[in-house]
């Protein structure tokens, strides 16, 4: 089953999104992705495997955004 988490607010979105999708991790999935808006551009990051793999792909990117969406895919 897929999980989707979105955030719009004053705080930085990345950590809120990642922590939110981790709470849905038990649902089972094979990949994940995150999209945020930075500098008026959509930035997308994707990874195969667990959320920890997406965290590696994200690294230091997507740190300034205050709006985004993250998902897992079955």
Can you say where each PLM-predicted feature lies in the sequence?
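N-terminal glutamine amidotransferase
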Residues: 1-74
